[in-house]
A protein has these predicted regions:
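PRPP-associated nucleotide enzymes
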Residues: 1-187
């Protein structure tokens, strides 16, 4: 059987995902020491099954090291494969060197993910100069598209919506949602 863990602030989504997939939900706890280090503690996964870690990667700098330790720990505890469900996938927008000396974080982060996780599920990543995650992540990856669901929710809950995007690169998503709603948009 597959086992599912939720990183802190991802527990509610992990619970819902466990209900819909039938995966066994297990505990993952982080303890923060006064010096800023973090201890990861987790229940053992079902042997020979996938271990799935749910962690949205907004504000990634504080999340990535504990996530790396959780993935390594669950593998050491017997998981056959380790997968990541990341509703938001960080570090994708820096996908080229815009100025001399800048890191191409999309490639670096994709490489780290490839060393750490056997598969990945994410929602509409910031792929501007890459056509697929396969260009930067070497394992199976599933991209979930949510424009129709988002438009459906907005249509039910918002009167006369205006769809707003934070920057020019968000236009690809903003325009689809606005078109589905027949609503104006601004980027």
């Amino acid at each position: 059987m597959n086992t599912l863990y939720g990183m802190p602030d991802n527990e509610t989504f992990a619970e819902l995902l466990a209900l819909h997939t039938g995966y066994r939900r297990q505990q993952l706890v982080l303890h923060h020491f006064p010096d800023g280090e973090t201890r990861v503690q987790m229940a053992a996964p079902d042997l020979d099954g996938d271990a799935v870690i749910v962690c949205t990667l907004d504000r990634p700098d504080a999340k990535v090291l504990p996530l790396m330790m959780a993935a390594a720990t669950v593998r050491e505890l017997g998981a056959a494969r380790v997968g990541l469900v990341a509703p938001y996938l960080a570090y994708m927008r820096q996908d080229m060197r815009f100025h001399p000396g800048e890191a191409i974080s999309a490639r670096i982060f994709g490489g780290w993910l490839g060393h750490t996780f056997d598969w990945l599920v994410t929602v509409e990543p910031h792929l501007h100069r890459y056509t697929t995650l396969a260009e930067i992540y070497p394992h199976p990856a599933q991209v979930v598209h949510v424009a129709a669901q988002l438009a459906g929710w907005i249509g039910v809950h918002v009167t006369r919506p205006l769809i707003i995007g934070p920057d020019s690169e968000s236009a690809q998503w903003v325009s689809v949602v606005a078109k589905l709603l027949g609503a104006p948009s601004v980027v």
